[in-house]
Amino acid sequence: MKYLALLLTILFFFQVDAMAQPTKKEPSGYKIGSIATDFKLQNVDGNMVSLQDYEKAKGFIICFTCNHCPFSIANESRLISLDERYKEVGYPVIAINPNDPAINEDDSFEKMITRAEEKGFTFPYLFDEGQRVFPQYGATKTPHIYLLQKTKKGLEVKYIGAIDNSSRDEDEVTERYLEDALNALLDGKEIEVKETKAIGCSIKVDKS
């Protein structure tokens, strides 16, 4: 009887301890197959931009990026190249700065304008004012890629992650994840690698 009481006591404490442990939170944001909603954000040219403006587009290369992050800077030329090649076949680049400029003034809208002019961006560079868009996507880094395709269901998420397997040096790229995904969509084939880890700087959020 003593053994039974002891066993019940041990089981009780295990149960209480398990209840006290925080549950693992599911990552929020879009997953492969999710349907992305549209947004309307200000571009560096002063115009408001939404995805519905692109009637002839087959989809979009959404890239969360910023002005100051060395990983973002290292990928700017790659984004320009991707935009120049793939917007002609229906997949333009849409870049979005998700950072709060109150945390890092280098990410201000004014400095976005300067950066876009200096680098010669061929794509819209939008400011996520109020930080409402990036949480919907689930972006955590800059740069962070979301490849969308127009389907009967809506804008379907087809690829999430990095542009390629070299976050800094383009000369060391051996796997081009985003290009492979785009080419698969254009060829009507299944994407082999649908998700990779985004490598970059954490998105700067005002936690006050």
Protein language model regions, located:
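Short active-site neighborhood of thiol/selenol oxidoreductases, capturing the structured segment around
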Residues: 50-73, 182
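Short, thiol/selenol-centered motifs that function as redox-active sites or metal-ligating centers
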Residues: 66-75, 145, 201-204, 208
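Structural microenvironment flanking redox-active thiols in thiol-disulfide oxidoreductases
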Residues: 73-118, 129-135
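Thiol-/selenol-based redox modules, centered on thioredoxin-like
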Residues: 147-208
